[in-house]
Design a protein with these regions (language model features):
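Expand to "…catalyze enediolate/carbanion chemistry for C-C bond making/breaking, isomerization
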Residues: 1-118
Length: 118
């Protein structure tokens, strides 16, 4: 089992804001959640995925836990979110609005399939 860490603070950062992504190393928090869901307008979702992936690939000194909040699995954006960010190995994926165990199981299946491809 993975070691559990106490998160005293979690900072939410919109995935479409390059200036905020660049400043993540400066924030004095335990964890960062980069949001690809509600914080990102529909017209900017594709660009936000690219920004988030590039940030994750370039952020080598991971002294903070980095989570990515994807769009809900019932949207047209969720699979693209996963395909974009999983290769950059975020510390975790946050699933919004999971209203049933089946939704969580579906995400588990998708993540397992991705891990098997590695």
């Amino acid at each position: 089992m993975a070691e559990l860490k106490l998160r005293r603070s979690l900072l939410y950062v919109p995935g479409n804001m390059p200036s905020m992504l660049q400043n993540i190393p400066l924030f004095g928090c335990d964890a960062i959640q980069i949001d690809l869901e509600d914080a990102v307008p529909y017209s900017e979702k594709d660009a936000a995925r690219i920004l988030v992936r590039r940030f994750l690939e370039g952020y080598k000194n991971r002294n903070k836990e980095i989570l990515v909040r994807i769009n809900g699995l019932d949207t047209k954006w969720a699979l693209d979110d996963l395909k974009a960010v999983l290769p950059a190995l975020p510390d975790g994926i946050r699933l919004p609005k999971a209203d049933s165990p089946e939704v969580v199981e579906r995400l588990d299946t998708l993540l397992t399939e991705y891990e098997e491809e590695l």
